[in-house]
């Protein structure tokens, strides 16, 4: 689950380069890319929560408790609907970006879902974070920060991306992903983390 931290940051930073590489040909212009990137970044904020829900929910199923995850899911769904109205209209009114409100509401509701699932397992004494897990989380966050700084420094300006052909964009995206991954793993190694720990 910790891998969601670097994945979230990388996707947020590379949102526009990814979109320009995949879609900005012909009628798909700079404004479309900007709007889509804003929505993608809002969804990205919930990436960790989406992963946690998939990990935490089976903890209830293993105890033959089918009702709690469903009840929590309903709470998250209702919250999502309420947040849609709270986010969409202000963003549409002030920034003409109501679609970002939909994505943001989904991410917030996902975090609520994950938090309630974790609280349920924690109260039941099934899931307790040990000190080693907290230390590991700090190492992951520090390594992800190093990766983010590198990506922000080496990612070309968007005006350059639009001048490239599709294969030039693709190669650059691949190189950026590899560079970010290398920076993350190297930083993690220096801090005492090991790759096999990511499987935990």
Task: Locate each region found by the language model.
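Membrane-embedded alpha-helical bundles of multi-pass transporters/translocases
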Residues: 1-200
């Amino acid at each position: 689950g910790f891998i969601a931290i670097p994945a979230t940051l990388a996707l947020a930073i590379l949102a526009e380069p990814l979109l320009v590489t995949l879609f900005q040909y012909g009628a798909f212009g700079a404004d479309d890319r900007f709007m889509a990137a804003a929505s993608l970044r809002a969804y990205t904020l919930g990436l960790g929560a989406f992963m946690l829900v998939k990990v935490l929910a089976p903890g209830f199923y293993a105890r033959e408790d089918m009702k709690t995850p469903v009840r929590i899911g309903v709470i998250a769904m209702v919250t999502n609907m309420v947040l849609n109205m709270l986010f969409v209209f202000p963003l549409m009114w002030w920034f003409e970006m109501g679609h970002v409100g939909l994505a943001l509401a989904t991410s917030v509701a996902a975090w609520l879902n994950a938090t309630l699932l974790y609280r349920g397992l924690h109260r039941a004494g099934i899931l307790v974070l040990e000190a080693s897990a907290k230390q590991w989380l700090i190492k992951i966050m520090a390594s992800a920060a190093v990766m983010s700084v590198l990506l922000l420094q080496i990612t070309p300006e968007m005006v350059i991306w639009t001048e490239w052909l599709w294969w030039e964009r693709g190669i650059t995206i691949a190189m950026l992903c590899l560079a970010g991954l290398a920076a993350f793993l190297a930083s993690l190694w220096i801090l005492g983390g090991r790759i096999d720990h990511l499987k935990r």
